């Protein structure tokens, strides 16, 4: 399957053959894509949320008032969960949210995410992702020619330093080497820009 190669000026400069098993899967598995995204989002959670239990709350262990004769409900501790300033029952604890997902499923999710973007016409192959200077204004002008609101840029094994520095201050734009290509960002961003090198490396990686 062939598709056109564009320059950073959004002009056609040639053609490239894409592996249909990676960029043009016939039936998109949305369930697999969602599975991988859920796995990614869970992995990104810090899991450091925590509340104090009765045993962890600071305070006296003295009985607040006598058992009988006050007319109040009996209480044994000011740190109990029903008391103001007391502990929390069944609150969140520090834990890892990471779940296991087979590598085959992760790989399949990436393939189907790339295929979905290509089917939508929002996956573009760029001849080179290199800039002469790390100027944000220059990159903003370049990206405006593609008429998109957000861009996920995937380069080869290494990212051009000037391009990376220029993209740092642009809202809704991210650039990563091919190893950073992931399902969540491919789906989240409106356009995916792939360098020619990224195409060949991804095809080798996902074969």
Curated annotation (Swiss-Prot):
UniProt keyword RNA-binding present: yes
* InterPro entries associated with the record: Ribosomal_uL4, Ribosomal_uL4-like, Ribosomal_uL4_dom_sf
**Record-level Gene Ontology MF annotations:** rRNA binding; structural constituent of ribosome
**Keyword annotations of the record:** Ribonucleoprotein, Ribosomal protein, RNA-binding, rRNA-binding
- SUPFAM superfamilies from the UniProt entry: Ribosomal protein L4
The biological process GO terms on file are: translation
Q: One GO CC annotation, please?
A: ribosome
The protein's role, per its UniProt record: One of the primary rRNA binding proteins, this protein initially binds near the 5'-end of the 23S rRNA. It is important during the early stages of 50S assembly. It makes multiple contacts with different domains of the 23S rRNA in the assembled 50S subunit and ribosome. Forms part of the polypeptide exit tunnel.
Q: How does it assemble?
A: Part of the 50S ribosomal subunit.
Official protein name in the record: Large ribosomal subunit protein uL4
Annotated organism of origin: Rickettsia akari (strain Hartford)
User: What gene is this protein translated from?
Assistant: rplD
């Amino acid at each position: 399957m062939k598709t056109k190669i564009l320059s950073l000026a959004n002009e056609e400069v040639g053609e490239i053959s894409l592996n249909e098993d990676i960029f043009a899967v016939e039936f998109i598995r949305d369930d697999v894509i969602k599975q991988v995204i859920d796995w990614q989002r869970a992995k990104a959670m810090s899991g450091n949320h925590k509340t104090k239990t009765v045993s962890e709350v600071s305070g006296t262990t003295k009985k607040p008032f006598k058992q009988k004769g006050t007319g109040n409900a009996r209480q044994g501790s000011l740190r109990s969960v029903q008391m103001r300033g007391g502990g929390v029952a069944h609150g969140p604890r520090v834990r890892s949210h990471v779940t296991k997902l087979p590598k085959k499923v992760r790989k399949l999710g990436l393939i189907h995410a790339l295929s979905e973007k290509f089917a939508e016409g929002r996956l573009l192959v760029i001849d080179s992702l290199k800039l002469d200077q790390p100027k944000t204004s220059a990159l903003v002008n370049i990206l405006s020619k593609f008429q998109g609101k957000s861009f996920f840029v995937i380069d080869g094994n290494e990212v051009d330093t000037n391009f990376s520095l220029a993209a740092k201050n642009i809202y809704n734009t991210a650039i990563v080497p091919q190893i950073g290509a992931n399902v969540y960002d491919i789906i989240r961003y409106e356009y995916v820009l792939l360098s020619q090198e990224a195409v060949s490396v991804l095809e080798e990686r996902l074969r």
